[in-house]
Curated annotation (Swiss-Prot):
Family under the similarity heading: Belongs to the MurCDEF family. MurF subfamily.
Pathway involvement of the protein, from the record: Cell wall biogenesis; peptidoglycan biosynthesis
TM helices/strands, residue ranges: none
Cited HAMAP family: MurF
Record organism: Buchnera aphidicola subsp. Acyrthosiphon pisum (strain APS) (Acyrthosiphon pisum symbiotic bacterium)
Main subcellular location: cytoplasm
Residue numbers binding ATP: 107-113
GO biological process, one term: cell division
EC number, as in UniProt: 6.3.2.10
Gene coding for it: murF
Name of this chain's protein: UDP-N-acetylmuramoyl-tripeptide--D-alanyl-D-alanine ligase
GO cellular component: cytoplasm
Length: 455
């Protein structure tokens, strides 16, 4: 991070400094990550208060603290009204002191994948930081921005939310030069109430956008008309898998196979053949988004192609695992909502052999959760999937609708049954999916263990 003094931090946060002034080169919020000489910010959440860890931080030679309480440690400290807000204020100051181009991403699905693709491309052209994992909330975004140094050329920041107001806050801290709303789908409906609520929350990203900046819009998500007033002074780039006529970036010659996807990408600078180490149409869309981001920064198409190919596979997101010859496991257990479930079905039906979807509940869908699960059952009936196994309160609605489904009450019985099917079939593809809370990765782990027994 950019070094700053405790006096400066007190000024930025409207806090009061007690003790000597020091130069700070590292800020931490987790005592497990403390290094000698760092500043520890004691955050307070709904279920925790980091002030109780200050004694531990002192033992590890923390140099100073930002607190909400007059704890009087034997080192300098700053008292502020709200430590979480103070963290954001410091991060916002650091962001303003760098010349890095900041790219901000939000949307219902694919944020992390687009972030990884974009960062992979930009690293071919200069020093780049990006959101670690999916730490995209009011704490994760400031912690990412604090990594910025003068030598950084780009920052790729993921902005997530589970309720209104959160993205407006992180966007204003980030002050992005280029933004993307990747898509709008039925996700986190408990917090946003409706699809319109999701759209309004994601559009909060415009609040921090600089004048005459660039906005990237997915024309396959039908909410552009609601955002026109927010982006009238911005440059706009459009991408789409379906709407070639109006798009700056679109694709043709799509081929999906067990190891990834290939297609021809059409851009304002011509067309180029692209290969991705990822499965699924949604990752084609994500690649178009990442390419539009990079194009806005004048990155050549050849570097975009190489960056996309070199993107690391994101764990538990349509991750293809060859267990045995002709036996494929697709781990898509990171999360689940209506759109990503439909995408998973489309991927599975293109895979070889006997096709089984194993699903847990899609969480946070609000009062219409049953209807959405039934909709997935109907979608699966129109696909080439052979079998669905479900577990969870709501996922039983999927197997009730699907013509060849079986519901389980616990993961142990599900895993045992699935292992038997796996052993009997000579050619099979199994896709496992569920919301984070369902912990469907346990089913994946059991299948991998079973496969290793045979080796």
């Amino acid at each position: 991070m950019i070094s700053l003094s405790l006096k400066k931090i007190a000024l930025i946060t409207n806090g009061t400094l007690y003790g000597a002034d020091l130069l700070i080169n590292e800020i931490v919020i987790d005592t497990k990550k403390i290094i000698p000489g760092c500043l520890f910010i004691a955050l307070i959440g709904r279920k925790f208060d980091a002030h109780i860890f200050i004694h531990d931080a002192l033992k590890k030679k923390c140099a100073a603290f930002v607190t909400q309480k007059n704890i009087k440690p034997h080192v300098p400290y700053i008292i502020v009204e709200n430590t979480s807000i103070a963290l954001g204020q410091i991060a916002g100051w650091v962001r303003k002191k760098t010349k890095a181009k900041i790219l901000a991403i939000t949307g219902s699905c694919g944020k992390t994948s687009v972030k990884e693709m974009t960062a992979s491309i930009l690293r071919k052209n200069g020093n780049t930081i990006s959101t670690i994992d999916n730490l995209n909330n009011n704490i994760g975004v400031p912690m990412t921005l604090l990594q910025l140094k003068q030598e950084h050329k780009y920052g790729v920041i993921e902005l997530g939310a589970s309720k209104p107001g959160e993205i407006a806050y992180t966007s204003n801290i980030s002050q992005p030069d280029i933004i993307l709303i990747n898509n709008i789908h039925c996700a986190h409906l408990q917090g946003f109430k409706s699809l319109l609520g999701v759209s309004k929350a994601k559009s909060e990203i415009f609040s921090g956008l600089k004048p005459n900046s660039t906005v990237i819009i997915n024309l396959d998500s039908h909410h552009f008309s609601q955002w026109k007033k927010d982006i009238k002074n911005s440059n706009i780039l459009f991408f789409s898998i379906k709407k070639k006529k109006y798009s700056n970036f679109f694709c043709s010659n799509i081929k999906i196979h067990i190891h990834g996807t290939s297609f021809t990408m059409h851009t304002p600078c011509g067309k180029i053949n692209i290969s991705l180490p990822f499965l699924g149409y949604q990752n084609i869309s994500n690649a178009l988004a990442a390419s539009a981001f990079s194009f806005a920064l004048k990155i050549p198409l050849k570097k975009i192609k190489i960056g996309l190919l070199d993107t690391p596979i994101v764990s538990k997101r349509l991750e293809s695992i060859i267990l045995e010859p002709n036996k494929i496991l697709i781990d898509d257990t990171y999360n689940s909502n209506v759109s990503s479930m439909i995408s998973a079905i489309k991927v599975l039906e293109r895979m070889p052999g006997y096709k089984i979807l194993v699903t847990g509940d899609m969480a946070e869908l609000g009062e219409n959760s049953m209807m959405y699960h039934q909709m997935i059952g109907n979608t699966a009936n129109s696909s080439a999937i052979n079998k669905i196994f479900s577990i969870g309160d709501m996922s039983s609605e999927i197997t009730k609708i699907f013509n060849n489904g079986k519901h389980f009450l616990n993961k142990k019985k599900l895993s045992e049954y699935l292992k038997n099917v796996f052993l009997k079939k000579k050619k099979i593809t199994i896709l496992v999916k569920g919301s984070r809370s369902t912990k469907m990765e346990k089913v994946v782990e059991d299948l991998i263990k079973e496969s290793k027994k045979k080796c």
